[in-house]
C-alpha cells in the first residue's frame, strides 16, 4: 500500500462509531471517494491526524520539562496543504522510504532542546527527517527519552457508554478480567501490522516506545512493552476491522484495543477544539468540504510527567 494511503486509511468501524458519537457535526454528510477525488472523509482524516500530533507536541512542550518533535512522516509532512501533504509522500515513495515504519514523535528532556534544534537546522529542518536513514540520525535518537506512536479518536471519552465500568471475568478471555466485546469505551489502539516494526525499532534504537491516544477531552498513554505483555498473557485479543484507503480499496486488518484501565492518564483538555469549516477545490472545480480542528489546549497530567521523569 502507498504510504499516503496507509497514513490516511480509515477503519470503517471507527467511522461508524465516530458518527454515532458526534452526530451534531454536519460535515459527516460528506462521504466522497478517496484519493483521486480528494474525498471529504480522507481530508477529515488528514486534518484529524495533524490536530492530534500537534496537540501532543504542544502539550509536552508546554510542561517546560520535556521537548517533543515530530519524527514520523505523518508529523513532519506539510500540515496546511493536503496536496503538499500528498506530494511529500510521493517523494518518500520515490526515494524508496515509503514503507519504513518510525514512531510519530521523539520526546527529550528540556535540557536537550538546544542540541535538538541545532541538529534539525543542520539537516534542513524536521521535514527532512524521514528522508535520512536512521544510522545517520543516531546522534539525535540517542538523546530521546521515549518515542511516541500517536493515535486519535473523535470521541468524548468520559461520555462513552462503558466509561467507568469495572472489568469483570470474561468467558472469551478464559475467565480473565475484561469487558464485553461490544463495549464502547476509551481504548489505546495498536495495529497488528505495526507491532513487529515498532518492536524492531525499539530494540535497535534502545529507546522505549509509548502509544499516546488522544480523545476530545482526554488522552491516555501505554508503554509498548506493557501492550505486548497484555497480548502475550491473553488479556487483550485482536479485533478484525475493515479499513478503507484513500484509493477506495478496503482491507481487513487486526488491531488491538487496550482498555484505558491498563493505560496511564496522559492529558486532559482545558479547551475544546473548534471545528472550522474548510474546503478545497480540485482542478475540475469540484468543491470538497471538510473540517479543520483549531484552538484547543491539552495539559499533560502529573501521572504522565512522573512516568517521563523515570527515563
Task: Annotate the PLM regions.
Residues 48-52, 189-194:
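Soluble or luminal CAZymes and related metallo-dependent hydrolases
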Residues 75-77, 153-155, 216-219:
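Short, solvent-exposed loop/turn segments at secondary-structure junctions
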Residues 37-38, 83-89, 124-132, 179-183, ...:
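Short linear interaction motifs
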Residues 1-29, 134-136, 162, 166-185, ...:
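Non-catalytic C-terminal interaction segments of nucleic acid-processing enzymes
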Residues 60, 103-129, 133-184:
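Conserved catalytic cores of phosphodiester-cleaving nucleases, focusing on short active-site segments
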Residues 68-71, 147-149, 209-214:
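A structural signal for short, well-ordered beta-strand segments and their strand-loop junctions
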Residues 1-101:
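Interdomain/boundary linker segments immediately adjacent to catalytic/signaling cores
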Residues 96-99, 137-141, 202:
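Short, charge-rich binding segments
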Amino acid at each position: 500500500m502507498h504510504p499516503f494511503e496507509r497514513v490516511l486509511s480509515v477503519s470503517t468501524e471507527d467511522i461508524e462509531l465516530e458518527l454515532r458519537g458526534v452526530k451534531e457535526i454536519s460535515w459527516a454528510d460528506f462521504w466522497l471517494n478517496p484519493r483521486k477525488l480528494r474525498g471529504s472523509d480522507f481530508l477529515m482524516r488528514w486534518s484529524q491526524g495533524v490536530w492530534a500530533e500537534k496537540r501532543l507536541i504542544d502539550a509536552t512542550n508546554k510542561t517546560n520539562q520535556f521537548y517533543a518533535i515530530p519524527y514520523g512522516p505523518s508529523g513532519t509532512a506539510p500540515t496546511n496543504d493536503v496536496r503538499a501533504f500528498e506530494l511529500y509522500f510521493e517523494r518518500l515513495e520515490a526515494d524508496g522510504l515509503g514503507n519504513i515504519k518510525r514512531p510519530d514523535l521523539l520526546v527529550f528532556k528540556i535540557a536537550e532542546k538546544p542540541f535538538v534544534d541545532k541538529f534539525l537546522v543542520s539537516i534542513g529542518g524536521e521535514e527532512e527527517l524521514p528522508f535520512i536513514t536512521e544510522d545517520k540520525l543516531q546522534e539525535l535518537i540517542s538523546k530521546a527519552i521515549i518515542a511516541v506512536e500517536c493515535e486519535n479518536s473523535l470521541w468524548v471519552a468520559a461520555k462513552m457508554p462503558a466509561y467507568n465500568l469495572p472489568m469483570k471475568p470474561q468467558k472469551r478471555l478464559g475467565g480473565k478480567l475484561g469487558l464485553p466485546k461490544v463495549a464502547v469505551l476509551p481504548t489505546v489502539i495498536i495495529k497488528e501490522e505495526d507491532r513487529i516494526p515498532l518492536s524492531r525499532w525499539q530494540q535497535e534504537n534502545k529507546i522505549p516506545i509509548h502509544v499516546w491516544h488522544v480523545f476530545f477531552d482526554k488522552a491516555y498513554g501505554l508503554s509498548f512493552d506493557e501492550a505486548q505483555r497484555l497480548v502475550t498473557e491473553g488479556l487483550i485479543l485482536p479485533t478484525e476491522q475493515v479499513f478503507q484507503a484513500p484509493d477506495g480499496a478496503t482491507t481487513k486488518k487486526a488491531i488491538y484495543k487496550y482498555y484505558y484501565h491498563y493505560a496511564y492518564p496522559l492529558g486532559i483538555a482545558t479547551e475544546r477544539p473548534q471545528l472550522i469549516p474548510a474546503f478545497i477545490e480540485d482542478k475540475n472545480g469540484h468543491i470538497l468540504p471538510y473540517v479543520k480542528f483549531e484552538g484547543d489546549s491539552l495539559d499533560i497530567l502529573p501521572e504522565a510527567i512522573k512516568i517521563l521523569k523515570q527515563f
